[in-house]
């Protein structure tokens, strides 16, 4: 996946602490069709011990800047409705809730709603 994203001109960033990975952030097109060529969807993952230190904000700033320079117009975050911290994190960065998809994903043995948040870059 890393090589594919980089070959497509997307960022794939890995954060390290004490020589080990503690977070990653990447993005790709929201949808494959040309009408969505300027709308991206990102993924950000931090280990629990790396949270609350500003690392997530730094990773997001870096991928948003990369996407903006590459011509992206907006960034989408898809967050499980149960992930209140993830939703709050994105809202604090200027993302607005634009949709909720009921029972869109299955995790931990149950169906979960998916929140869609968007930021115009």
Regions found by a protein language model. Give the residues of each.
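Conserved GNAT acetyl-CoA-binding A-motif
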Residues: 60, 67-79
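Conserved catalytic-core motifs of GNAT/GCN5-like acyltransferases
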Residues: 26-29, 34, 76-79, 91, ...
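Aromatic/hydrophobic pocket-lining residues that form π-stacking "cages" and hydrophobic walls in ligand
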Residues: 1, 63, 86
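Acetyl-CoA-dependent GNAT
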Residues: 1-49, 60, 120-121
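Residues forming the Rossmann-fold NAD(P)(H) cofactor-binding site
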Residues: 53, 57, 61
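Short hydrophobic/aromatic beta-strand or adjacent loop that forms the aromatic wall/cage
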Residues: 10, 112-116
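Conserved active-site alpha-helix within GNAT-family acetyltransferase domains
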Residues: 20, 57, 69, 81-100
